[in-house]
Amino acid sequence: MSNFAIILAAGKGTRMKSDLPKVLHKVAGISMLEHVFRSVGAIQPEKTVTVVGHKAELVEEVLAGQTEFVTQSEQLGTGHAVMMTEPILEGLSGHTLVIAGDTPLITGESLKNLIDFHINHKNVATILTAETDNPFGYGRIVRNDNAEVLRIVEQKDATDFEKQIKEINTGTYVFDNERLFEALKNINTNNAQGEYYITDVIGIFRETGEKVGAYTLKDFDESLGVNDRVALATAESVMRRRINHKHMVNGVSFVNPEATYIDIDVEIASEVQIEANVTLKGQTKIGAETVLTNGTYVVDSTIGAGAVITNSMIEESSVADGVIVGPYAHIRPNSSLGAQVHIGNFVEVKGSSIGENTKAGHLTYIGNCEVGSNVNFGAGTITVNYDGKNKYKTVIGNNVFVGSNSTIIAPVELGDNSLVGAGSTITKDVPADAIAIGRGRQINKDEYATRLPHHPKNQ
C-alpha cells in the first residue's frame, strides 16, 4: 500500500511576534518546514500535501515543485486543516502521515519507525507519543487498564487526573487514509477552543472498536513543537549538538562544540580542526586537514584542503588548497583564491580572482580584480575600482610586484613581470617587464629644518 503525507503549515504563529510565517523561521540554516519535509521523505510518500494559510505565497515558495498545496483560509483547528486535503487524498488506499510543520527536530528514522509500527500492528490510527516529567500544555494520552489508547485529551479539556499523565501527544499521527476522511465527517467543535481537533478522530475509532495504537519516541527532544522564540532557540541548540556530533564521529575535531555553529547542509572532510566561535553557514564545504581558528565566519563558500583560516570572514567565495587567510581578513562574495595564496591581516578581497602563490600580507584592498600567479602586494595597496557610479576592473599579470602604499586606479592593466614602485598612483597600463613609478620626486633642502619650531635650536 502507498504512503501519503500531510504537513500542517497554515498557522501564523502569533507568539513568535513576527511577520514571517512560523514554519519559515530557520533552525540550523533552513526553515522548520524544510526540516520536516526532509524527514517526511524517509517514508517515501506517493503524495505529499502541505496545508498553507497565513502568507501562503511565502510558504509555497519554499517547497515549490516538491509538494502539492491546499489552502486553509480560516484556521479552525488541526482537524479542519486535514479536511482541506480531501480533494487530493480522499478515497485513496494507503497510510497517511499527519505532521505539523513546526517540529524541526523529528527525524526521518522516527517517522519510518512510526509508519512501520502502524503497519505491523494493523492499526487504523497510530499516535506518535513521548514521555516527559513536565507535560503541561500537551495533549495527554489516555489509556485503559490494558494500556490500550482510549483517547487524546487536550490540556484545556483535561481533568485534574488526566493532567497528571506524563505520556503526551506529539501532534504526529498515521492513519488508514480512507478511514481518516470518513471519520473527519463526524467531528465537531464542541470543545474549549471551538475548533475541529484531529485528535477527536481517535475517539471515533475507539467507539467503533477499531484498533488505535501509540508509538513512543526514544528521544523527547524530537517532539518539540516551536511556538515562540524560546522554543526556537531550544530547537537550534539541539540541532547544533546533533550536527556537531555527526561531524565529530566523522573525524572532525572541535575545541568547543557548544560554541561552534554549523548549518545542516555544511560539508566537512575528516581531519579538519575547528576552534571555538566558528560559524559555518549555508552550502559551505571544508576540505580535509583545514584549520579554522577562533572567530572564523564562512558563508556559502568552498575551502580546499590544508587551508588555515584565522579569525576571518569568507562569503560566497572559493578558496583553494593550502591557502592562508587572516587574521582579520574579509573575502567578500564572488572571489576565488588559488592554491597557496596568502591573504593576511586587514586585507579585503571583493569580486576578484587571485592566482596561486600570490600574497597580500596586510592592509590591502583588492576589488574587481583579475590577479595572476606569484604576485606580491605591498602593505597599503589599494585598487580603486569605483568612481561613484560605475565599477571598473583591474588586471594584474603573473609575477607582478606592487610596492607598499600604492594606489591602482581602474580600469588598468599591469603586465607580466612588471613592478610598481612604492607610493605610486597608477592610472595607465604598465607594460610587461616594465617598472612604473607614479609619485613626486624627493627633494632635500639642507638646513631647512633648523628654521622650524620643533628643532632643538628653537626650543
UniProtKB/Swiss-Prot annotation:
Sorted alphabetically, which PROSITE patterns does this protein's record hold?
HEXAPEP_TRANSFERASES
Keywords recorded for this protein, A-Z: Acyltransferase, Cell shape, Cell wall biogenesis/degradation, Cytoplasm, Magnesium, Metal-binding, Multifunctional enzyme, Nucleotidyltransferase, Peptidoglycan synthesis, Repeat, Transferase
Please give the InterPro entries that the UniProt record associates with this protein.
Bifunctional_GlmU (IPR005882), GlmU-like (IPR050065), GlmU_C_LbH (IPR038009), Hexapep (IPR001451), Hexapep_transf_CS (IPR018357), NTP_transferase_dom (IPR005835), Nucleotide-diphossugar_trans (IPR029044), Trimer_LpxA-like_sf (IPR011004)
Q: Where is this region: Pyrophosphorylase?
A: 1-229
Q: Where is this region: Linker?
A: 230-250
Q: In which pathway does it act?
A: Nucleotide-sugar biosynthesis; UDP-N-acetyl-alpha-D-glucosamine biosynthesis; N-acetyl-alpha-D-glucosamine 1-phosphate from alpha-D-glucosamine 6-phosphate (route II): step 2/2; Nucleotide-sugar biosynthesis; UDP-N-acetyl-alpha-D-glucosamine biosynthesis; UDP-N-acetyl-alpha-D-glucosamine from N-acetyl-alpha-D-glucosamine 1-phosphate: step 1/1; Bacterial outer membrane biogenesis; LPS lipid A biosynthesis
Concerning its family, UniProt says:
In the N-terminal section; belongs to the N-acetylglucosamine-1-phosphate uridyltransferase family. In the C-terminal section; belongs to the transferase hexapeptide repeat family.
Q: Which residues bind Mg(2+)?
A: D102, N227
Q: Name one GO cellular component term.
A: membrane
Q: From what organism does this protein derive?
A: Streptococcus pneumoniae serotype 4 (strain ATCC BAA-334 / TIGR4)
List the EC numbers from the record. 2.7.7.23, 2.3.1.157
Write out the annotated subcellular location.
Answer: Cytoplasm
Q: Which residues bind UDP-N-acetyl-alpha-D-glucosamine?
A: 8-11, 22, 72, 77-78, 101-102, 139, 154, 169, 227, 332, 350, 365, 376
Q: What class of enzyme is it?
A: transferase
In the record, what terms sit under GO molecular function? glucosamine-1-phosphate N-acetyltransferase activity; magnesium ion binding; UDP-N-acetylglucosamine diphosphorylase activity
Q: Required co-factor?
A: Mg(2+); Ca(2+)
User: Major location, coarse class?
Assistant: cytoplasm
Q: What is this protein called?
A: Bifunctional protein GlmU
